Each structure stands twice: as structure tokens, then as C-alpha cells.
Amino acid sequence: MLGLLGNTTLVCWITGTALAFLMLLWLMALCLFHRSQEHDVERNRVRQARPRLFHGRRLRLPRLVHHHHHHHVTGVTSVGVHHHHHHSPHRLHHHKHHHRHHHAHGARR
């Protein structure tokens, strides 16, 4: 009977040690995974902090018609759109002045 009790104690010690070791590994993996997610959250915050204007600019195809041309008379084709240029964001203010000036003079060629 004493031999069986000694074997059971030994098995319990080995099982307990193995479980403790596995839980320690699991805890370390959990901490490392959580830390990597914190870095992703920081990167996402940086992405969200950037203005939408700059988000994904490299992949966007050029537009044929600007959004501010939609107020023109319906039925007019985009034949006269070629005189407009795509401007970089820092020249947008200048473009609005040019646009008003251009349409104030009847958009003559």
C-alpha cells in the first residue's frame, strides 16, 4: 500500500510540474500576443490620425471628371474637361481660385 501511495505522489508531482510549466508557457505566449496587438493598435491610431485625403493615394486611379463638375447642365459631355489638371493637395486652395476665375470668364478657349 505504501508503494502505491509513493507512486501516486510521484505521478502527482510530475503532473503538477508539467501543468505548471505548460501554464507558464501559455501565460508567456498570451503576454507576447497581447504586446504585438498593442503595437498594431498604435499603428492603427497613426493611420487614423492621418487625414483621409492622403489615405491610399498611391493606389487610386486618376478620375476623369472632378466631383465639382456635377453641377453643370445635364446632357453636357466631358469633352471640355481636359483643361482641368489634377493638383496635389497643397495646391488645392489655388485650384479653387483658378476654378472660379476660369468659370467666371465663361471657360473660353
UniProtKB/Swiss-Prot annotation:
The chain crosses the membrane at residues 13-33. GO terms for cellular component: membrane. Pfam families: HRCT1 (PF15758). It is a single-pass membrane protein. Residues 77-109 are annotated as: Disordered. Keywords: Membrane, Transmembrane, Transmembrane helix. Its main location: membrane. It comes from the Eukaryota. It is found in: Membrane. The keyword Membrane applies. Residues 81-109 have a biased composition (Basic residues). This is Histidine-rich carboxyl terminus protein 1.
